């Protein structure tokens, strides 16, 4: 990206590339100073700032991308670690539990002050405590306590993962245009008047109060407002567990923990654990998870098809600004200008630091903005009319207009209403044929840019000469009421021996 100082001067926004490199700068020393300053700043930081920095660091990590590389191996490790601990507890600690807890069944003679007075008795008790068997059993006792701590930690970890999977990922959607709400558990009614109020502060107490007391109260209060549908909206709480939590839940499932915790674990139990892990992964990840992905792909394909077949053909029509010469001189000049509207092309207008207006267009092939030159730019200039241009040199400018009007009179239906019939004085109801240039085209019909719209020509309201009106009525024996005024006009300019059909008909009637 670049910063436009003027139309001709632009500066790159990334100023790091413009800085000169220092040959005496040691990158290793700079990194050491940076780490030292960070380490020193930890002692001057408030604990609340530590919490904010830690949460920001956790939230900025893309956990979904680490679901296969981190979540799945970690969950499987927890599951098999739980299996190994339970196997050692039942096969190693439980058979020797009586030997491990032997000191708790009688008095500890080593702590007796009376026995210490007798050296031979004290020596006997000291040798017994230092025997190999006693050391082994003491080691098993400490190992059993370590196994108990591991079982408690793994159980709490599994409970936390289960809670985050089932109740820790919800998104609320407000449905304002849904008239009849579905009968679902996670869909509730709410008033539009309380839309900006925070009813739930998100605390544990408010959640418990909602589940124990608030559910029935809200359902009863919303049922009374079924008639007034204009003041309510629906809230949908969608369950959206992340891919990382889902993979961690599947690989370290609570069903496996409960199964290993309440059954006799042996070496054959490993087969059941492996089958359980495979079935759960196949069911949730491979089948149901891929089904959701496939449905989203199908929905995206349907939207793309609707956009390609329905939206784009109607919203992105290929139009172009046109300037048409509508003067009576019949020059037939047509200028095609590029469309400068934002809904037709990727065109943006910005201002430089000096206040100059810059028009840029986005080039999808290069992914860059390019300047668009709009001053004096025309395309496809047509200067010759596509029909008999030579006739325009001998006839008046309205010859084609009058012939086209009278040619359409024979095919024009009779208008029963009081609407004005299309005549040459109302040419707006007659459109030229496609692909032909006609002076009937209005000067405002071909352009959408106001700055390109020319003034209306004063010659458009000029009447044709009386001598050329003979071509308007080339049929004989017509009883149209319009013939009488035409005859009067012609009698002023033509001789009595005219051989027109009008004069012959009048001569026969006089005779």
UniProtKB/Swiss-Prot annotation:
InterPro entries: Nur1/Mug154 (IPR018819). The chain crosses the membrane at residues 146-166, 255-275. It is found in: Nucleus membrane. It is a multi-pass membrane protein. GO terms for biological process: maintenance of rDNA; regulation of exit from mitosis. Pfam families: DUF2418. Residues 420-511 are annotated as: Disordered. Residues 439-448 have a biased composition (Polar residues). Keywords: Membrane, Nucleus, Transmembrane, Transmembrane helix. GO terms for cellular component: nuclear membrane. It comes from the Eukaryota. Belongs to the NUR1 family. Member of a perinuclear network that controls recombination at multiple loci to maintain genome stability. Required for rDNA repeat stability. This is Nuclear rim protein 1. It comes from Zygosaccharomyces rouxii (strain ATCC 2623 / CBS 732 / NBRC 1130 / NCYC 568 / NRRL Y-229). The lineage of its organism: Eukaryota, Fungi, Dikarya, Ascomycota, Saccharomycotina. The gene is NUR1.
């Amino acid at each position: 990206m670049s910063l436009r100082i003027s139309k001709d001067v632009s500066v790159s926004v990334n100023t790091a590339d413009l800085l000169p490199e220092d040959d005496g700068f040691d990158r290793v020393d700079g990194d050491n100073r940076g780490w030292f300053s960070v380490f020193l700043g930890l002692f001057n930081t408030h604990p609340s700032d530590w919490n904010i920095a830690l949460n920001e660091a956790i939230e900025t990590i893309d956990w979904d991308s680490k679901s296969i590389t981190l979540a799945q191996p970690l969950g499987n490790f927890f599951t098999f670690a739980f299996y190994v601990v339970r196997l050692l507890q039942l096969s190693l600690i439980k058979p020797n539990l009586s030997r491990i807890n032997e000191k708790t069944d009688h008095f500890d003679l080593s702590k007796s002050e009376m026995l210490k007075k007798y050296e031979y008795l004290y020596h006997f008790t000291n040798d017994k405590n230092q025997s190999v068997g006693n050391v082994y059993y003491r080691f098993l006792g400490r190992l059993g306590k370590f196994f108990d701590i591991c079982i408690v930690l793994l159980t709490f970890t599994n409970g936390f993962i289960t809670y985050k999977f089932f109740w820790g990922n919800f998104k609320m959607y407000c449905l304002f245009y849904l008239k009849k709400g579905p009968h679902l558990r996670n869909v509730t009614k709410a008033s539009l008047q309380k839309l900006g109020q925070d009813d739930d502060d998100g605390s544990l107490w408010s959640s418990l109060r909602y589940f124990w007391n608030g559910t029935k109260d809200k359902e009863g209060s919303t049922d009374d407002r079924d008639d007034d549908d204009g003041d309510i909206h629906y809230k949908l709480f969608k369950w959206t567990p992340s891919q990382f939590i889902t993979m961690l839940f599947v690989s370290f499932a609570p069903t496996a923990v409960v199964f290993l915790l309440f059954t006799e674990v042996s070496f054959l139990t490993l087969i059941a654990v492996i089958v359980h892990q495979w079935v759960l992964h196949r069911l949730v990840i491979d089948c149901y998870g891929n089904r959701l992905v496939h449905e989203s792909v199908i929905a995206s394909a349907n939207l793309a098809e609707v956009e390609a077949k329905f939206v784009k053909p109607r919203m992105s029509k290929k139009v172009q600004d046109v300037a048409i010469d509508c003067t009576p001189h019949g020059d037939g000049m047509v200028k095609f200008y590029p469309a400068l509207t934002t809904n037709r092309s990727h065109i943006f207008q910005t201002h430089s630091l000096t206040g100059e207006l810059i028009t840029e267009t986005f080039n999808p092939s290069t992914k860059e903005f390019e300047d668009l030159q709009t001053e004096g730019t025309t395309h496809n200039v047509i200067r010759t009319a596509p029909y008999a241009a030579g006739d325009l040199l001998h006839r008046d400018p309205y010859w084609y207009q009058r012939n086209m009007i009278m040619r359409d009179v024979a095919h024009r239906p009779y208008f029963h209403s009081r609407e004005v019939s299309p005549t040459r004085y109302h040419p707006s109801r007659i459109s030229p044929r496609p692909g032909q240039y006609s002076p009937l085209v209005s000067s405002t019909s071909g352009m959408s840019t106001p700055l390109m719209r020319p003034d209306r020509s004063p010659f458009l309201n000029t009447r044709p000469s009386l001598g050329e009106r003979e071509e308007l009525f080339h049929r004989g024996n017509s009883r149209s009421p319009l013939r009488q005024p035409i005859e009067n006009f012609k009698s002023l300019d033509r001789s009595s021996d005219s051989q027109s059909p009008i004069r012959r008909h009048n001569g026969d009637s006089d005779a």
